């Protein structure tokens, strides 16, 4: 394990003033057997820690940095915008510019509301769905992550019809989670039993899902499952909400809605839409969105919602992804890294599964294709922790969890992709 004395000292100091020394738990690297990274700066595809060590970055601020770190066009636009002021709590014209850009790209979005985090976006979308339908139950799926609002932090029951959930965090009253139904992802028959059950069928306000899950590893919804959900929501009078905080503008220009021939009623965005700044959004059909205050009776607000600095970064981010050949080049780089690894795994029949959606992917240490949370939990986390440390010591940073997505950016250098590929293949050859 490489020595990082300055990181160690700073982390010790952080622990005195911040719980666990981090402001989001996954950053602690708790299951990786080492202290977390402490970053000094970054550029393009490279992180530099406070000890001066460099790392090729496959986290990319958890998918937000599709253009890489410190993209010059985004930085220049943000610097010019900051000269006008940083925050007003009053409307600015750039909010409309970014809104128009999203509406132009996403067919299902007719109006949009900006917020500051993915949690705010999903939380507000659910409140809006309940207000629109005048129903109370929400359906989510095991392993899908929609932020940390109380009604999302739910554990499923032990059987298909045991839908009385329990909270997955302390501090959440039991009554809060009673109206969240947590069902198996990609399981049509299990969902059908609930959707047609007399206790729930006419009480479901919305179904929310990640069309391509990214927080239990990269796991796409099947086309059949997605079409089933759209059919059932229409029949029940419920809304279908896509959580595209991760997949939006990542897997394709139109996000997952480029991949599935299904149009949701509401979509949640984050990460790329903020260009590396704290911004997120939710949008959908005009008749639904017009229920938001001040037009309607569904309340949603935020002091920093539509912050002009974040809007500028987001606008530049979305303009960059529309350049000719952007996604073709992004996917070429991803394939350059992954294809030889996939071929070697297949040739040797190793118990490893790489699941990919465009430029996001997960390397699962398990034999069979992963379709849901139950499959994902079969992956060998001990091997993954060893894998993480081995790559880290060679200057390669991947998300510190078996059940997270990796990301390629437009800024990744081919030489760094080849370096990473070689390190991965060496580890696999030595351990399988």
UniProtKB/Swiss-Prot annotation:
- The answer to keyword Cytoplasm applying to this record is yes
Recorded hits in SUPFAM superfamilies, A to Z, give: PLP-dependent transferases (SSF53383)
Query: What's a Gene Ontology MF term here?
Result: pyridoxal phosphate binding
* Known pathway: Porphyrin-containing compound metabolism; protoporphyrin-IX biosynthesis; 5-aminolevulinate from L-glutamyl-tRNA(Glu): step 2/2
Q: What is its main location?
A: cytoplasm
Essential cofactor(s): pyridoxal 5'-phosphate
Which PROSITE patterns does this UniProt record tie to the protein? AA_TRANSFER_CLASS_3
**Where, if anywhere, are coiled coils annotated?**
none
Q: What is its EC number?
A: 5.4.3.8
Positions carrying N6-(pyridoxal phosphate)lysine: 271
**Compartment(s) where it occurs, according to its Swiss-Prot or TrEMBL record:** Cytoplasm
Report the enzyme's class at the first EC level: isomerase
Any one Gene Ontology BP term? protoporphyrinogen IX biosynthetic process
Which keywords annotate this record? Answer: Cytoplasm, Isomerase, Porphyrin biosynthesis, Pyridoxal phosphate
Q: Name one GO cellular component term.
A: cytoplasm
Is Isomerase among the key words of this record? yes
- Which residue pairs form cystines in this protein? none
Q: Which reaction does it catalyse?
A: (S)-4-amino-5-oxopentanoate = 5-aminolevulinate
Q: What protein family is recorded?
A: Belongs to the class-III pyridoxal-phosphate-dependent aminotransferase family. HemL subfamily.
**Summary of subunit composition and partner proteins:** Homodimer.
Annotated protein name in UniProt: Glutamate-1-semialdehyde 2,1-aminomutase
Q: Which organism is it from?
A: Protochlamydia amoebophila (strain UWE25)
């Amino acid at each position: 394990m490489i020595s990082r004395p300055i990181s160690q000292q700073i982390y010790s100091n952080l622990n005195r003033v911040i719980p666990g020394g981090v402001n989001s738990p996954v950053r602690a690297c708790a299951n990786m057997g080492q202290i977390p990274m402490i970053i000094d700066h970054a550029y393009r595809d490279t992180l530099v820690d406070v000890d001066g060590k460099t790392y090729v970055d496959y986290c990319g601020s958890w998918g937000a940095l599709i253009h890489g770190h410190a993209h010059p066009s985004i930085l220049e636009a943000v610097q010019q915008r900051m000269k006008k002021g940083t925050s007003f709590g009053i409307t600015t014209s750039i909010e409309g510019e970014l809104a128009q850009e999203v509406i132009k790209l996403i067919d299902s979005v007719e109006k949009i509301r900006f917020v500051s985090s993915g949690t705010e976006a999903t939380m507000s979308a659910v409140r809006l769905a309940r207000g629109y339908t005048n129903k109370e139950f929400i359906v989510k799926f095991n392993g899908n992550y929609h932020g940390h609002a109380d009604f999302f932090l739910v554990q499923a029951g032990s059987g298909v019809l045991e839908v009385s959930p329990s909270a997955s965090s302390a501090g959440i009253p039991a009554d809060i989670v009673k109206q969240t139904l947590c069902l198996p992802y990609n399981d049509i028959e299990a969902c059908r039993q609930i959707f047609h059950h007399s206790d729930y069928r006419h009480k479901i306000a919305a179904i929310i899902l990640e069309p391509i899950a990214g927080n239990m590893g990269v796991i796409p919804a099947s086309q059949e499952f997605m079409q089933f959900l759209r059919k059932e929501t229409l029949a029940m009078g419920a809304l279908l909400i896509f959580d595209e905080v991760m997949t939006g503008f990542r897997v394709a220009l139109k996000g997952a809605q480029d991949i599935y021939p299904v149009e949701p009623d509401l979509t949640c965005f984050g990460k790329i839409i903020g260009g590396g700044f704290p911004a997120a959004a939710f949008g959908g059909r005009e008749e639904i969105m017009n229920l938001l205050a001040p037009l309607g009776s569904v309340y949603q607000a935020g002091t920093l919602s539509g912050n002009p600095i974040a809007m500028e970064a987001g606008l530049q981010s979305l303009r960059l992804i529309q350049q000719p050949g952007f996604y073709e080049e992004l996917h070429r780089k991803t394939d350059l890294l992954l294809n030889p690894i996939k071929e070697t795994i297949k040739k040797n029949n190793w118990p490893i599964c790489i699941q990919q959606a465009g430029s996001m992917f997960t390397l699962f240490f398990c034999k069979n294709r992963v379709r849901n949370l139950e499959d994902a939990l079969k992956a060998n986390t001990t091997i993954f922790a060893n894998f993480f440390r081995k790559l880290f010591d060679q200057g390669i940073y991947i998300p510190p969890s078996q059940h997270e997505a990796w990301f390629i950016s437009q800024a990744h250098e081919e030489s760094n992709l080849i370096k990473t590929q070689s390190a991965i293949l060496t580890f696999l050859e030595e351990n399988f």
